[in-house]
C-alpha cells in the first residue's frame, strides 16, 4: 500500500505541482489551504507524511507543525519554503519540522527530502 501524503499550501498551483510530482509513488490523502485545515486533516487521515508550506493565512505552517507534533510526536513533516526564508525555517525546525524543500523545486529534490525523512 502506498504511503499517504497530506499536501498543505495556500497556493493551488503549488499543491497541484506537488500532486504531479508525488502521485506516481504516493497516495494523496487530501489537500489543505491553511494550517487550521492541516491540523484537522492530519487528525482525520493520519498520513505518513505532510508537505507543509510555511507562509499561509489563518494559521501558518510553523504553528500547524507545532500543533501536529503535540498531537503526534512521530509525525513526518517537510516544510516547503521560498528562498530567503532562513529565519522561518529555523523556527519550523524548532516547531518539529523534519526537513524542508526550497521553492521553486524539482522532483529529485522533493523525492530526496522525502526519502531522508521517511528513512531516518
Swiss-Prot record:
Q: Which InterPro entries match?
A: CheY-like_superfamily, CheY_signal_transducer, Sig_transdc_resp-reg_receiver, ST_Response_Regulator
Keywords noted in UniProt = Chemotaxis, Cytoplasm, Magnesium, Metal-binding, Phosphoprotein, Two-component regulatory system
Q: Name one Pfam family in it.
A: Response_reg
Gene3D superfamilies (UniProt xref):
3.40.50.2300
On modification after translation, the UniProt record reads: Phosphorylated by CheA.
SUPFAM superfamilies, sorted: CheY-like
Q: Where do the annotations place Mg(2+) binding?
A: 9-10, 53
Q: Relay the cofactor remark from the entry.
A: Binds 1 Mg(2+) ion per subunit.
Q: Name one GO molecular function term.
A: metal ion binding
Where in the numbering of this chain does the Response regulatory domain appear? Answer: 4-118
Cofactor dependence is on: Mg(2+)
Q: Which domain of life is it from?
A: Archaea
Localized where? Answer: Cytoplasm
Task: Describe what happens without this gene.
Answer: Deletion leads to the loss of both chemotactic and phototactic responses.
Give residue numbers for the modification (4-aspartylphosphate): 53
Q: Which GO terms describe its biological process?
A: chemotaxis; phosphorelay signal transduction system
Q: Name one GO cellular component term.
A: cytoplasm
What does this protein's UniProt record list under function?
Involved in the transmission of sensory signals from the chemoreceptors and photoreceptors to the flagellar motors.
The record's note on quaternary structure and interaction partners says:
Interacts with CheA.
The protein's name? Chemotaxis protein CheY
- What lineage does UniProt assign to this protein's organism? Archaea, Methanobacteriati, Methanobacteriota, Stenosarchaea group, Halobacteria
